[in-house]
């Protein structure tokens, strides 16, 4: 009984110390507004993907104080085998995929075979996910069979590659950009992009 009381007292003290030490913490993004992207806007990006076939479309790039976060829509068509040198790696930006529709096979590993730097002028480097490499293959890769509803988290520095897509795969991607290497994109820029790419 005495041991139980001591454990409970220790937990209470730890909680109180934690609460007191947390009182001096300031928000990392003071007075920042929330960002809302309605389903109707996401659907417009899906329509652009079907009409013009851009694989990766940035919808927003948001400053959160100490970091930035990007929200993108990615649509990939049927793939029977991977293209040469299609392993991608991003040095500073992590990615989270939420699969909306379709299915495919993705491989991931931090061990990239014959990695070569992407040029700074590359659209992906400049506008989407910052500096990184493309590689010929992955060593010790893990394979994920992705389908609607699945989530895949790819840390910065980890190579990733679709090796097969059954019919298509469409996913919402959230990029975590702590070094702020990706330019900002607001709602007005999104509207302009959609107007320019409507068919």
Label each residue range with its predicted role.
Residues 88, 94-98, 143-144, 151-152:
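His/acidic/aromatic-lined binding-pocket segments of jelly-roll/cupin-type domains
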Residues 1-4:
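Positively charged n-region of N-terminal signal peptides that target proteins for export
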Residues 7-19:
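Bacterial N-terminal signal peptides
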Residues 18-91, 184-192, 196-199:
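A short, N-terminal "cap"/entry segment at the start of jelly-roll beta-barrel domains
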Residues 117-146:
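Double-stranded beta-helix
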Residues 145-166:
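Conserved metal-binding segment of the jelly-roll/cupin
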């Amino acid at each position: 009984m005495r041991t139980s009381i001591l454990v409970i007292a220790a937990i209470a003290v730890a909680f109180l110390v934690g609460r007191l030490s947390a009182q001096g913490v300031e928000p990392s993004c003071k007075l920042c507004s929330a960002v809302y992207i309605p389903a109707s806007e996401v659907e417009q990006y899906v329509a652009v993907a079907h009409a013009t076939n851009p694989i990766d479309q940035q919808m927003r790039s948001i400053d959160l104080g100490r970091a930035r976060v990007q929200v993108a829509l990615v649509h990939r068509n049927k793939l029977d085998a991977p293209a040469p040198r299609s392993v991608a790696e991003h040095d500073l930006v992590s990615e989270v995929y939420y699969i909306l529709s379709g299915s495919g096979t993705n491989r991931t590993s931090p061990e990239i075979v014959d990695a070569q730097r992407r040029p700074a002028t590359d659209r992906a480097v400049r506008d989407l996910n910052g500096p990184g490499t493309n590689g010929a293959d992955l060593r010790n890769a893990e394979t994920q069979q992705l389908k609607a509803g699945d989530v895949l988290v790819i840390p910065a520095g980890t190579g990733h590659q679709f090796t097969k897509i059954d019919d298509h795969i469409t996913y919402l991607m959230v990029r975590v950009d702590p070094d702020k290497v990706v330019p900002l994109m607001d709602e007005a820029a999104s509207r302009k992009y959609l107007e320019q790419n409507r068919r």
